């Protein structure tokens, strides 16, 4: 049984504040996350540069998938930094781990989280990235609360959504 489905959590929402909760992208769609056009479509290099991440900080990529953003951030923060890759799908984390090993990166910690909790250590993160994943949160209040607990005093959250999933 996957950790995300731990039955101790609150019931999942189908909508939140009038917004339909999108279905989580299945791990079998992972190749799409690495598509060649992604840089052109999303201007990822520009976005990462604008984050102004510094060597030695700790970052968390919520909904990391197979690590498209995680690996970029891990490279910037360097070996003295700590990157947390947080995902509810262990299959995605396995792919991320393989990519990190291939790239020789050892500063990435994988976290298989639950739907309602990022499962990050408290007051441990300088920067949190949620790239194109918030619309999939079935427990938005609980997730944001757990992310807030993980932030250091001056921690920053970046919420990035590329398109409207809900027709409303």
Predicted feature locations:
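Short glycine-centered segments of the SAM/dcSAM-binding site in methyltransferase folds
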Residues: 58, 82, 154-156
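Hydrophobic beta-strand segment of the Class I
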Residues: 59, 128-129
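Conserved class I S-adenosyl-L-methionine
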Residues: 156-168
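A short acidic, Gly/Pro-enriched loop at the edge of an enzyme's catalytic core
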Residues: 118-128
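Residues lining the SAM
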Residues: 131-134
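A short glycine-rich, Lys/Arg-flanked "PGG" loop and its adjoining helix->strand segment in the class I
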Residues: 75, 141-156
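Class I SAM-dependent methyltransferase SAM/SAH-binding core
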Residues: 60, 66-117
């Amino acid at each position: 049984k996957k950790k995300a489905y731990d039955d101790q959590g609150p019931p999942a929402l189908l909508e939140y504040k009038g917004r339909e909760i999108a279905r989580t992208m299945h791990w079998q769609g992972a190749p799409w996350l690495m598509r060649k056009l992604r840089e052109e479509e999303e201007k990822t290099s520009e976005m990462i540069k604008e984050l102004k991440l510094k060597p030695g900080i700790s970052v968390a990529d919520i909904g990391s998938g197979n690590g498209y953003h995680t690996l970029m951030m891990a490279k910037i923060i360097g070996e003295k930094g700590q990157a947390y890759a947080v995902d509810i799908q262990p299959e995605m984390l396995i792919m991320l781990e393989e990519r990190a090993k291939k790239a020789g990166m050892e500063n990435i910690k994988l976290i298989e989280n639950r739907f309602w909790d990022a499962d990050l250590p408290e007051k441990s993160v300088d920067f949190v990235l949620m790239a194109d994943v918030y619309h999939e949160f079935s427990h938005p209040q609980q997730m944001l609360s757990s992310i807030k607990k993980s932030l250091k005093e001056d921690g920053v959250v970046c919420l990035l959504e590329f398109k409207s999933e809900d027709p409303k």
